[in-house]
Design a protein with these regions (language model features):
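Accessory carbohydrate-binding/adhesion or oligomerization-edge regions at the termini
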Residues: 1-68, 88-90, 141-178
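Residue-level detector of functionally pivotal "anchor" positions at catalytic/ligand-binding pockets or at interdomain
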Residues: 3, 65, 75, 171-198
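Aromatic-lined ligand-binding clefts that engage carbohydrates, nucleic acids, or primary amines
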Residues: 57, 81, 89, 95-118, ...
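Extracellular beta-rich ligand/substrate-recognition surface
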Residues: 68-84, 126-134
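A general beta-strand register signal
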Residues: 117, 196, 213-214
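Short, glycine-anchored, charge-dense loop/turn motifs used at functional sites
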Residues: 120-121, 197-200
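C-terminal tail/sorting-segment detector
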Residues: 209-222
Length: 222
């Protein structure tokens, strides 16, 4: 996972890299369709689902492009075939804490007409193309909850077009590291202790603000 430092004491972790994030190419699975009209039946078959049978998918390295001057790592005959792409990634409990307090962005450069899916749910789409530029879609909180511990998959479909075609996309989280949980050493009988902001221990059932120690982690409840 790539990390960059930002202004205002925040950092950005790239969950899925793009060429722009500095890691270059990215592994994926892809499938080329025959016609744009094949995308709709593929959607009805839920090609974007987390539990999709991937035995007939091809392994590839993105980005994909028909133009050697635009993101070309894997050749995509975009004037002939629409394409479906699946990118798997793994999240830890620590990653989910960052996601909960942070801003999660989908970043993408496309040509043409992409539709994005996260763990089987449609995220966003775009019309046409954006050349060498990148669009950004900020995941609302309800969509951030789609991200789970363990395996996740971010998918995209693109249509065949008369001109060029390409796709580069990734996922990042920007957060304040001072707000993430801090690992602590705790004894088995010390599974949960709750303190108020004055440092006084209170009932674990309280709804008051304070510092919560649970399962070896310290979390600030605001």
């Amino acid at each position: 996972m790539t990390r960059t430092a930002n202004a205002a004491d925040t950092v950005t972790d790239f969950i899925l890299d793009t060429v722009d994030s500095g890691e270059g190419s990215w592994p994926c699975l892809f499938y080329e369709l025959n016609y744009n009209s094949d995308i709709s039946p593929a959607e009805k078959a839920k090609w974007y689902a987390l539990d999709e049978d991937e035995s007939y998918w091809r392994e590839g390295i993105g980005p994909f492009s028909i133009d050697q001057n635009k993101f070309l790592v894997t050749q995509w005959q975009s004037t002939v075939h629409p394409i479906l792409i699946r990118r798997h990634f793994t999240l830890t409990e620590e990653d989910l804490q960052k996601i909960e307090i942070g801003i999660v962005n989908l970043t993408y450069s496309y040509d043409e007409n992409p539709i994005f899916w996260l763990n089987g749910i449609r995220l966003t789409s775009a019309t046409g193309w954006n050349d060498n530029n990148y669009a950004t879609f900020r995941l609302p909180n309800i969509r951030k909850k789609l991200l789970v511990k363990g395996d996740n998959v971010l998918c995209v479909s693109l249509q065949q077009g008369a001109g060029g075609g390409h796709i580069d996309y990734g996922l990042s989280v920007t957060y304040d590291p001072t707000r993430t949980a801090i690992s602590l050493i705790s004894s088995p009988e010390e599974k949960e202790r709750v303190y108020n902001l004055l440092g006084q221990q209170i009932s674990a059932d309280t709804k008051h603000q304070g510092i919560i120690i649970t399962q070896g982690k310290k979390i600030i409840r605001k």
